[in-house]
Amino acid sequence: MKRSIVKNASLLGLFALLCTALVALVNQFTFERIKQQQDLELMRTLHQIIPDEMHDNALIEHCILIQDADVLGIDEPLPAYIASQGGEPVAIAMETVAPDGYNGQIKLIVAIDAKGEVLGVRTLNHNETPGLGDKIDLRKSSWVLGFKGQSIQGEQDKRWAVKKDGGQFDQFTGATITPRAYVGAVKRTLAYFNANQQTLLNRPANCEVQYE
């Protein structure tokens, strides 16, 4: 009887060990697949906002980490991607966060050329209200395309606000908080780049850990 109990316990232990190993293997495989999909989506986004003819490097491979909660809207460091042509930096795409969206944080990426002009903006993640605040998503509206070609004349540039606040950017019908937060995030990012352009564009890549 005792021998049977020990045998059954051993079998159960072995079964549990095998199940744990299988779950770990599946989780690792799933994580890698998700990571690959995220990287592919990021590369597609980068090529949308920084034209291929502007650079000859692999954008995702020249990644730097930037940490400034006041500008980026989040305590943790966020990646930025340097575009270069013939070894010379020509543009940057900076991830940033609008912490004051209607339904929480809005994560976006802002591409800026060496002259300080916006090349493009895209929304990476948000929880804004469908049919109202989700117009920040290019799949829902062309609103984000309005940032292309824009620049900033100092941090007090009053054009960088929604029209309801005296600025030049459209708000959404029934949803002002979302575009107001979004415009503010792009403005802060652009002002930060203008103030730190040489340091940012000439910083060596340091995102290796992120892409292991």
Swiss-Prot record:
Its cofactor is FMN. Coiled coil: none annotated. It is a single-pass membrane protein. GO terms for biological process: electron transport chain. The chain crosses the membrane at residues 9-29. GO terms for cellular component: plasma membrane. Its main location: membrane. The modification FMN phosphoryl threonine is found at T176. GO terms for molecular function: electron transfer activity; FMN binding. Part of a membrane-bound complex that couples electron transfer with translocation of ions across the membrane. This is Ion-translocating oxidoreductase complex subunit G. The gene is rnfG.
